[in-house]
């Protein structure tokens, strides 16, 4: 079964990599082999997927498309506990006291760097992912992104499932990367990324601070995010059509359907 699945996966990946506007920039053969091991049940535990990339690369959109497509398939075929999402942003340290002291989040952010991995408790995130992979239910933290910098701990139950997926700026950094079976990096051109950032900044009413925020994020990305691409099994194009991502995921799910349903 493993040999058959690996052969089919190689063909599916080959066809996509050689298509116009492919979703892939790079795929390691070891990633395809590992996927075949999971799909053939040679590895019987849950698998974990980490998706990283700089701000406005498209990683959150890609992660949600993966989650929604798999959940739709799971509902159709009555598969329980198909996929669980771990939100990396929920692991930002609680800095609500510092926000209050500064008078506003904007003032706080001028003196506190949120664009470095040290701003997040990534060791706790790794612990939670490992616990889920061992079949345990975990209570996750929840970080308030509205500007209070409040993090409430042990509030969101996460249940063990077949796939644990997480995306974030620092998902492939040293303190957490070993938690993932599949390491994915989303690559995007500078011009597209900048355009997306400023569109989002306008929606969030960043005003005059947008330039400063963008410059800081870009500079820190060169140090903390871009180098993590070297750890990736798969590099995706953050500029590919969303429909192309869904189509590819459905091809993998069609193989699952052929084998097990």
Where on the chain are the PLM-derived regions?
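NTP-dependent small-molecule kinase module
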Residues: 5-43, 159, 178, 195-202, ...
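The conserved Walker
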Residues: 55
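Conserved lysine of the Walker
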Residues: 59
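Hydrophobic positions on the alpha1 helix immediately C-terminal to the Walker A/P-loop
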Residues: 62
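Short beta-strand-centered segment that lines the nucleotide-binding/catalytic pocket of NTP-utilizing
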Residues: 75-96
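Conserved nucleotide-sensing/catalytic segment adjacent to the nucleotide-binding pocket
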Residues: 93-143
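ATP-dependent NMP and nucleoside kinases share a basic, alpha-helical "lid"
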Residues: 151-201
């Amino acid at each position: 079964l493993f040999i058959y699945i690996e052969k089919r996966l190689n063909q599916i990946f080959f066809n996509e990599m050689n298509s116009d506007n492919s979703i892939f920039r790079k795929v390691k053969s070891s990633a395809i082999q590992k996927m075949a091991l999971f799909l053939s049940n040679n590895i019987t535990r849950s698998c974990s997927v980490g998706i990283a990339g700089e701000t406005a690369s498209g990683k959150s959109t890609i992660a949600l498309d993966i989650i929604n497509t798999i959940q739709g398939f799971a509902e159709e075929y009555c598969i329980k506990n198909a996929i669980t999402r771990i939100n990396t942003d929920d692991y930002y340290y609680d800095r609500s006291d510092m926000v209050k002291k500064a008078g506003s989040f904007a003032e706080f952010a001028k003196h506190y760097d949120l664009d470095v991995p040290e701003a997040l408790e990534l060791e706790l995130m790794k612990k939670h992912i490992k616990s889920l992979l061992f079949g345990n239910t975990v209570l996750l933290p929840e970080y308030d992104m509205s500007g209070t910098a409040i993090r409430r701990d042990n509030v969101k139950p996460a249940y063990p499932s077949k796939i644990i997926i997480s995306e974030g700026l620092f998902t492939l950094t040293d303190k957490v990367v070993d938690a993932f079976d599949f390491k994915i990096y989303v690559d995007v051109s500078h011009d597209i990324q900048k355009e997306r950032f400023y569109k989002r900044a306008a929606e969030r009413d960043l005003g005059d601070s947008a330039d400063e925020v963008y410059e800081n994020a870009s500079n820190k990305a060169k140090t903390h995010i871009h180098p993590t691409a070297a750890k990736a099994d798969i590099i995706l194009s953050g500029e590919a059509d969303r429909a192309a991502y869904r189509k590819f995921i459905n091809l993998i799910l069609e193989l699952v359907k052929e084998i097990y349903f």
